[in-house]
From Swiss-Prot:
Cellular component per GO, a single term: bacterial nucleoid
Organism: Klebsiella pneumoniae subsp. pneumoniae (strain ATCC 700721 / MGH 78578)
Signal peptide from the UniProt entry: none
DNA repair in keyword set: yes
Function description: Involved in DNA repair and RecF pathway recombination.
Keyword terms: DNA damage, DNA recombination, DNA repair
Family designation: Belongs to the RecO family.
Source organism, top-level taxon: Bacteria
GO terms under biological process: DNA recombination; double-strand break repair
Pfam families tied to this protein: RecO_C, RecO_N
Name of this chain's protein: DNA repair protein RecO
Length: 245
């Protein structure tokens, strides 16, 4: 693949004394693994560019699963993520790395990713809505088709006040029992529209995407979630100290 492509680095690690191994999400080739030769050397002009959340143009080639990075240019500065939004971005990157197969084209998902990162960078409030929209988009691109608007048992439109149990590969069926796998019709309509007007619908969306993504992630926990759990107590402690000053 010798043409230029839009891309983002999802993750990088040292590869030999002077090179980097990159996990990259590209517009045309999907997720690819690239060796950036000499990128760690002092004279390399790629050091600053090959960072997560920096919009790139890349060229690469070679045979086998691991390709060689030929050229890379930063289209703009890295999108400004920090604190909660940084951990949210790392979560999105890890999610893509875990669930997408190598060299499978996901051009529409690439732009869903771009919009998510842009939303995180510009977020003045909670990053949760942007994360839930991306997770739902990802599930759709993976072929995870769910009808949120109709009861799988009767085919009737969902009712805002009724409760529905989610059953994998079937959909939502009316239920009298309320537990972690049940959602109201109001929740389901919010999931269908990807609009979350209140905390309740956001929490329901998070519950659903956790359930739906679990088969793709297997039993291995996400590292970014653990980092976020460690970050939150430290953030609260800093806020408490500031308030006590």
């Amino acid at each position: 693949m010798d043409g230029w492509q839009r891309a983002f680095v999802l993750h990088s690690r040292p590869w030999s004394e002077t090179s980097l191994m990159l996990d990259v999400f590209t517009e045309e080739s999907g997720r690819v693994r690239l060796v950036a030769k000499g990128a760690r050397s002092k004279r390399s002009n790629l050091k600053g560019a090959l960072q997560p959340f920096t919009p790139l143009l890349v060229r690469f080639g070679g045979r086998g699963e691991v390709k060689t990075l030929r050229s890379a240019e930063a289209v703009s500065l890295a999108l400004p993520l920090s604190g909660i939004t940084l951990y949210s971005g790392l979560y999105v990157n890890e999610l893509i790395s875990r669930v997408l197969e190598h060299e499978t084209r996901f051009s529409e998902l690439f732009f869903d990713y771009l919009h998510c990162i842009q939303a995180l960078a510009g977020a003045s409030g909670s990053p949760e809505p942007a994360l839930r929209r991306f997770e739902l988009a990802l599930l759709g691109h993976l072929g995870y088709g769910v009808d949120f608007l109709h009861c799988a048992g009767s085919g009737e439109p969902v009712d805002d006040t009724m409760t529905y149990r989610y059953r994998e590969e079937k959909g939502f069926i009316a239920s009298l029992v309320i537990d972690n796998n049940t959602f109201t019709g109001h929740h389901l309509k919010a999931l269908a529209s990807r609009e979350f007007p209140d905390v309740d619908t956001l929490r329901a969306a998070k519950r659903f995407t956790r359930i739906a993504l679990k088969p793709y992630l297997g039993g291995k926990p996400l590292k970014s979630r653990e980092l976020f759990r460690q970050f939150m107590p430290a953030r609260k402690a800093r806020a408490d100290n500031t308030n006590n000053d």
